[in-house]
């Protein structure tokens, strides 16, 4: 490799160009700071500064005594949804039932065009959003919007984190969150979960290991369906109280449909925090809108970051969300939808139990999670041969493989539940 430069910026740019051109490849070790400084005739601090910039840009990664290596290029991970045209019965997509979603176009009110300089958050939506957030956010919170939960996670993390920063996440973890961490170059620290949410000792270990942020799901964890209990929330708060500098993100994506109570995990000592509530499951994934309640400094950084890009979330989307959230008819429809999702998941749980397959009853969300003691892929393939498409649990894993099946039950009928349960029993026995 031919690295040149007399300043930190010049050394950074020289290495950057070689990485982009392919002359330096992922995993390749960069020269030790001392050696490169001697070769270039410059101060070691200059080289160290250049390497630090490469790390922050996600181009290289400092690995302690091993030195600094060129980072692997991020690749797209598994995505929610399934490909159109598949002949398989879709129990893998993670989608809500389209029949449970309101017809937003019919709700849209006639509004005058919004122009530059219009307040970025519509006051009608703001009032309705505060009704959704006020009781669950710490006092003095600020309201912001994003283009869905994953966009909110990406934006809030970017307010306070740089590539290489450790972020504590549940294992297994929601696909959108995993992809966000990979794309931004954050280091995911796996935190084991159980039926009551993040395990306290596992979170403590991640924080002691240097986690700069914690991302967790209070209800309807995807893929397991777990919800944080009151007892667990209290224990998690006690741990987080000792780390006031750590950013806490709470992804309450299923809030409007959940049948589980919300138990707050953000302690009063936490300085940087955000509670995210997406409208995708309740009003439709294409709405691309999430409500964010957060501390004032995070809100200011979100606005600063939004301003030179999209500027604001479209007022057409805000109008649709406000019309739906303010409609008694839509509220009743969401109530029926939430009840329906519980009933459909219970149909499958009972059908599996009838076939001798015991599944945890305390779940929430659009899916049923079936833990396995082995790699799920042979079972996924066996079910595909019988006409079913499900998600193998390994795609949700953070470092340590998690074996299981995520089965989307949002549109499942009683007949299909019984057929699937029989086919699953046969596949397990094969």
Predicted regions and their residues:
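N-terminal basic, amphipathic alpha-helical segments
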Residues: 1-117, 121, 127, 307-314, ...
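Amphipathic, non-transmembrane alpha-helical secondary structure
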Residues: 12, 16, 154, 158, ...
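Short glycine-rich anion-binding loops that position phosphate/pyrophosphate groups of nucleotides
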Residues: 96, 219-221, 281, 412
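Conserved core of the PLP fold type I
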Residues: 114-244, 256-274
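Residue-level detector of anion-binding/catalytic polar loops
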Residues: 166, 187, 247, 358, ...
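Walker B catalytic acidic pair
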Residues: 251-252
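PLP-dependent aminotransferase class I/II
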Residues: 274-352, 357-360
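Short, solvent-exposed loop/turn elements at beta->coil junctions and helix N-caps
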Residues: 278-279, 393-397
């Amino acid at each position: 490799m031919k690295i040149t430069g007399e300043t930190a910026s010049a050394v950074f740019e020289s290495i950057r160009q070689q990485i982009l051109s392919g002359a330096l490849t992922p995993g390749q070790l960069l020269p030790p700071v001392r050696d490169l400084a001697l070769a270039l005739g410059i101060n070691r601090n200059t080289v160290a500064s250049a390497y630090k910039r490469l790390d922050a840009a996600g181009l290289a990664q400092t690995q302690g005594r091993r030195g600094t290596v060129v980072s692997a290029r991020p690749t797209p991970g598994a995505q929610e949804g399934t490909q159109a045209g598949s002949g398989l019965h879709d129990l893998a997509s993670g989608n809500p039932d389209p029949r449970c979603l309101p017809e937003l176009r019919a709700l849209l009110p006639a509004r005058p065009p919004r122009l530059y300089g219009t307040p970025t958050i519509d006051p009608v939506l703001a009032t309705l959003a505060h009704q959704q957030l006020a009781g669950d956010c710490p006092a003095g919170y600020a309201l912001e919007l994003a283009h869905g939960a994953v966009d909110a996670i990406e934006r809030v993390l970017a307010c306070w984190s740089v590539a290489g920063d450790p972020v504590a996440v549940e294992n297994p973890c929601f696909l959108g969150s995993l992809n966000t961490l990979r794309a931004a170059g954050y280091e995911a620290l796996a935190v084991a979960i159980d039926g009551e949410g993040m395990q306290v000792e596992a979170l403590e270990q991640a924080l002691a290991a240097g986690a700069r942020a914690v991302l967790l799901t209070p209800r309807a964890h995807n893929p397991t369906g777990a919800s944080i209990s009151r007892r667990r929330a209290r224990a998690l708060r006690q741990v987080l109280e000792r780390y006031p500098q750590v950013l806490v993100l709470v992804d309450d994506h299923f809030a409007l449909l959940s049948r589980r109570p919300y138990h707050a995990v953000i302690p009063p000592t936490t300085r940087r925090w955000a509670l995210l509530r997406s409208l995708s499951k309740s009003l439709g994934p294409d709405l691309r809108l999430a409500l964010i309640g957060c501390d004032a400094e995070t809100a200011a950084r979100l606005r600063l970051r939004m301003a030179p890009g999209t500027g604001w979330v479209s007022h057409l989307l805000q109008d649709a969300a406000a019309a739906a959230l303010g409609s008694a008819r839509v509220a009743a429809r969401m109530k029926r939808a939430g009840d329906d999702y519980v009933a459909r998941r219970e149909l499958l749980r009972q059908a599996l139990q009838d076939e001798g397959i015991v599944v945890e009853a305390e779940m929430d969300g659009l899916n049923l999670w079936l833990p396995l003691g082995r790699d799920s892929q042979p079972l996924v393939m066996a079910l595909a041969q019988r006409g079913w498409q499900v998600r193998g649990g390994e795609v949700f894993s953070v470092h340590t493989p998690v074996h299981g099946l995520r089965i989307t039950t949002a549109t499942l009928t009683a007949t299909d539940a019984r057929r699937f349960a029989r086919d699953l029993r046969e596949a397990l026995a094969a």
